[in-house]
Structure formats: C-alpha cells, structure tokens
Amino acid sequence: MDELRINELNDYQEKALRTWKSAGSLESRLQNVALGLSGESGEVADAVKKAIHHGHGFSQGYITAGNPKAIPVKEVIKELGDIMYYVSVGAHELGYTLQEIAEININKLAKRYPEGFSVEASINRVDVQGETLGLHYKDYSKEIRKN
C-alpha cells in the first residue's frame, strides 16, 4: 500500500485533497475548515478532559487494561489526524503547502524563543515588543473579498 505511505508533508497534503470538496466561495470553504478544526479540536479536548479531570485515564492502543472508561490513545491520535487534515486543506485554500506552513511556524518560534522555550522568554516575548517576525505571507485579502 505504498500509495498510502507519506514521505513528506506536501505528499500528505496532496493525498488529503483527494477527499476535499472545493466547491463554493473561498469564504465558505474557509468556514468549513474553521468549523472542522474547531470540531476536531473539541474532540481532542474532550478526550483529554475525561482522561485527566474525570479520572478515566488513558489506555495504550484500544485496550482499556481493566478500566472500561479509559480513553484509548489511538482514538486521540485519529482526532489529531483529522486536525491535520483540516490544517492541510486550509493551507491549500489559502495557497500554501504544508511545507510552507511548517517553515513559517518554525521561523516564528525561532524568532519568538531564540534560545528555546522558557517561562521568562514567554513572558518577555521579543516578537511582541515592536519587532516583526520578518515572515513573508501571501496577500489573499483581495481574493477573499471577491468570493
């Protein structure tokens, strides 16, 4: 099943787009992405809440190891995959590859935390003290307004 093997982020994005319905306006498609991200993120948050705050705990794989209410890690992983799907199609709708999104994010984090994350660096972030990140984004504001 080599056609399902993912070697690079852009490879994943290309395969994920096979199931994306890109009909309608850009605004409508982005709304679909945002609602999908919200829904899938909510499912991850609910699983974590039940595992930690309701005392269900996590179980490896699908096996609950004596606790029938334990949250299977594989179920959480599936939801994280759904989030990745919506990030992928959202990036596509805005004209970006997943590779570009990943690079923009890594550059942002490197500028925000040049010495790595620390509580002090988080409190005194350099990227919010008048410095710009120097990242280059595509301007889709006109495209979004047209659709």
Residue spans for each PLM region:
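Flexible "arm" and connector segments at domain edges
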Residues: 1-80, 84-147
